[in-house]
């Protein structure tokens, strides 16, 4: 799930409502926790959710996929692939299993952003034999993501 200012605003509002936080200190704490998830103009940020409906299957898969978040990459057509920066707030994996939730940051150079804005493809993938995948982002989705670079 790619994050932007609006999705983070909704998450903050939801947490304030659910936790019945109305005081300024509590609101400031929620803002401090969630604001780092907003793209800063040179990156995209996403929440990776690894979901399995069956609890036992989820346990097996999270163990099988230990550290998979370190194999995720982004690539702008014509440029080298770049590893994502995962879980800056705290380590969510260990040698035995990965977490079901990861926070990812994808950094882009000015040249890469310009290439995306002028038609180059955007690719995301996982460079790991346990789950090899590469996806070229649909043009309409890419256009939405480009708004985070302004």
Explain the meaning of each model-derived region.
Residues 1-43, 51-150:
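Long, contiguous binding/interaction regions
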């Amino acid at each position: 799930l790619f994050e932007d200012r609006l999705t983070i605003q909704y998450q903050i509002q939801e947490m304030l409502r659910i936790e019945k936080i109305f005081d300024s200190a509590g609101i400031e704490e929620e803002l401090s926790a969630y604001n780092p998830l907003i793209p800063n103009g040179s990156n995209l940020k996403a929440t990776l959710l690894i979901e399995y409906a069956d609890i036992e299957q989820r346990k097996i898969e999270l163990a099988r996929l230990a550290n998979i978040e370190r194999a995720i990459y982004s690539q702008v057509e014509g440029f080298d692939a770049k590893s994502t920066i995962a879980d800056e707030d705290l380590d969510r994996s260990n040698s035995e299993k990965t977490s079901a939730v990861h926070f990812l940051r994808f950094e882009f150079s000015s040249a890469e952003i310009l290439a995306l804005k002028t038609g180059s493809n955007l690719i995301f993938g996982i460079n790991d034999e346990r789950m090899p995948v590469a996806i070229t982002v649909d043009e309409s989705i890419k256009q939405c993501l480009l708004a985070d670079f302004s």
